[in-house]
Amino acid sequence: MIDNYNRNINYLRISVTDRCNLRCVYCMPPEGVKQTPHSEILSLEEFARVVDAASDIGIRKIRITGGEPLVRKNIVNLFEKISTNSAIDDISLTTNGVLFAEMASDLKKAGLNRVNFSLDSLNPDTFRDITRMGKFNDVWRSIQKALELELHPVKLNVVAVRGINDHEFADFARLTKEIPIHVRFIELMPIGECNPWAVGNFIAAEEILHGLQQKFGLLDTQVKVTGSGPAKYYCLPNSKGTIGFITAISEHFCAGCNRLRLTANGQLRPCLYGKQEFDLKTPLREGASRQELAKIITKAIRHKPSQHHMEDGWRDRRVMSQIGG
């Protein structure tokens, strides 16, 4: 469906839970956050109903996120349900990778096409400092499993944090020469309770790119990678993978935004950084028809803003795991 700014909205990101088995320093406080009661979170069947309605108005790509989506009980069943919808041509997953290896084969059989891993360090000790949990070896095993199953393109999402992992950017770049992996450096976003901390540790993508070019020389920009995202991709000479940058803060990509976000408790957000939400949980539980749900989704698309205004300050106290990354 085309919105008011001539953007084709064809991509729905679904947060299936606000729970997570890690406690990343930029995402939530050490004690975690107040969890949404299970009764308030949509069932897998309700998520599938939303997908069916959304597909009627042009949604073609689905990404399952969290929290950590793989902690959701019976999550494989949701992939199976979505894959039966012939209008959906791409089903992807964003995960921290802790549980992925043991579920990977079942997920692929259920319809998973590709996977993104959140991995902010290649050093187990630094990884533990960032996640407050560790389990680096589990994550690395999951990445290897995704490559083995050819869930291409396999992407690594690296949140760039000054003083934490900025000394590892070259190591991530070298990784793309060794294996067919696509590393994306993501600018730290000032979201939720971690807002002041994030502002002080921000690194612009341009600074990262400049540092890599000083080390490796000019990077090739004639690169395309499968996906619906906003990353700009580069590659090192003779590399098997690519290096990408997601510049949500320094150079927003709102003009090309093609997505909606559905929170675990059934609120549809036209913009991740906006305040407006459209309630789908209530009509779902009141027996709304597929057509009625599609009308609500259409309304949300009509209200999608031209761009975010995060530079004016983040006023939502919820953290990313609660909204859906």
Swiss-Prot record:
Keywords: 4Fe-4S, GTP-binding, Iron, Iron-sulfur, Lyase, Metal-binding, Molybdenum cofactor biosynthesis, Nucleotide-binding, S-adenosyl-L-methionine. [4Fe-4S] cluster 1 binds at residues 20, 24, 27. PROSITE patterns: MOAA_NIFB_PQQE, RADICAL_SAM. It is an enzyme of class 4 (lyase). It holds the Pfam family Fer4_12. Binds 2 [4Fe-4S] clusters. Binds 1 [4Fe-4S] cluster coordinated with 3 cysteines and an exchangeable S-adenosyl-L-methionine and 1 [4Fe-4S] cluster coordinated with 3 cysteines and the GTP-derived substrate. GO terms for biological process: Mo-molybdopterin cofactor biosynthetic process. GTP binds at residues 13, 63, 94, 155, 259-261. The keyword ATP-binding does not apply. SMART domains: Elp3. GO terms for molecular function: 4 iron, 4 sulfur cluster binding; cyclic pyranopterin monophosphate synthase activity; GTP 3',8'-cyclase activity; GTP binding; metal ion binding; S-adenosyl-L-methionine binding. Belongs to the radical SAM superfamily. MoaA family. This is GTP 3',8-cyclase. The gene is moaA.
